[in-house]
Amino acid sequence: MWFLILFLALSLGQIDAAPPGQSRVVGGYNCETNSQPWQVAVIGTTFCGGVLIDPSWVITAAHCYSKNYRVLLGRNNLVKDEPFAQRRLVSQSFQHPDYIPVFMRNHTRQRAYDHNNDLMLLHLSKPADITGGVKVIDLPTEEPKVGSICLASGWGMTNPSEMKLSHDLQCVNIHLLSNEKCIETYKNIETDVTLCAGEMDGGKDTCTGDSGGPLICDGVLQGLTSGGATPCAKPKTPAIYAKLIKFTSWIKKVMKENP
């Protein structure tokens, strides 16, 4: 599981953290300004990414659960004043019912179970204003194709030796890999509800602070960052993402029942 404990209040003037797990963009680049308008920052007891799928709804990783959240939208840089920046509180959160939190796990289970059904919906206390820098992205309608070039994004650490978030939103281009590649690394992963993406040669990855952020393959939102190996970007150790096509019915049901 990849998540990041904040050492600061929401001033965001200085962002340092110590990760109990791992999830950041490594080997990436500064995203083009406003190119990822659905990307949000989710701040609770941990720092995570998230995705705006409706003006009132954000989807993120279940392991990013907190009692309270603040959501930053329209951000490219976490510390600068930006014209499209918005801030929202969260009125309700809904972890997937089949996600098993760490504190409830049977200790005989292997770590890969952390990543199964790892998604959560956040109901914003006030709908986001849709602008040039804040937009929703549609849920997938078809299975992603192995070999697709995918884009992951987030403000997670870019250097595993520095416990510090990136101020600028980072993007990284990686390949969607086969289930077999995932099973080689994570023996008990449930590949029907997860995706594996990365570079088998290493060097490019998501990592600490990126959990819950988007994985967009061939222009379609297909996954949410869940976790991976430590340190990030190791050869032959792709990262794990929640496979959203398997959860669209649950997502729509929760949104409909909680207008």
Swiss-Prot record:
The active site is at 63 (charge relay system), 118 (charge relay system), 211 (charge relay system). Belongs to the peptidase S1 family. Kallikrein subfamily. PANTHER family: KALLIKREIN-1 (PTHR24271:SF47), KALLIKREIN-RELATED (PTHR24271). Its EC number is 3.4.21.35. GO terms for biological process: positive regulation of vasoconstriction; regulation of systemic arterial blood pressure; zymogen activation. Disulfide bonds join 31-171, 48-64, 150-217, 182-196, 207-232. The keyword Lipid metabolism does not apply. It comes from Rattus norvegicus. InterPro entries: Peptidase_S1_PA (IPR009003), Peptidase_S1_PA_chymotrypsin (IPR043504), Peptidase_S1A (IPR001314), Trypsin_dom (IPR001254), TRYPSIN_HIS (IPR018114), TRYPSIN_SER (IPR033116). Pfam families: Trypsin. Residues 1-18 form the signal peptide. Glandular kallikreins cleave Met-Lys and Arg-Ser bonds in kininogen to release Lys-bradykinin. This enzyme has a vasoconstrictor activity. KLK-9 has both a chymotrypsin-like and a trypsin-like properties. This is Submandibular glandular kallikrein-9. Glycans are attached at residue 106. Keywords: Disulfide bond, Glycoprotein, Hydrolase, Protease, Serine protease, Signal, Zymogen. One of its GO terms (cellular component) is secretory granule. Residues 25-256 form the Peptidase S1 domain. SUPFAM superfamilies: Trypsin-like serine proteases. It catalyses: Preferential cleavage of Arg-|-Xaa bonds in small molecule substrates. Highly selective action to release kallidin (lysyl-bradykinin) from kininogen involves hydrolysis of Met-|-Xaa or Leu-|-Xaa. One of its GO terms (molecular function) is serine-type endopeptidase activity. Residues 19-24 form a propeptide. Heterodimer of a light chain and heavy chain linked by a disulfide bond.
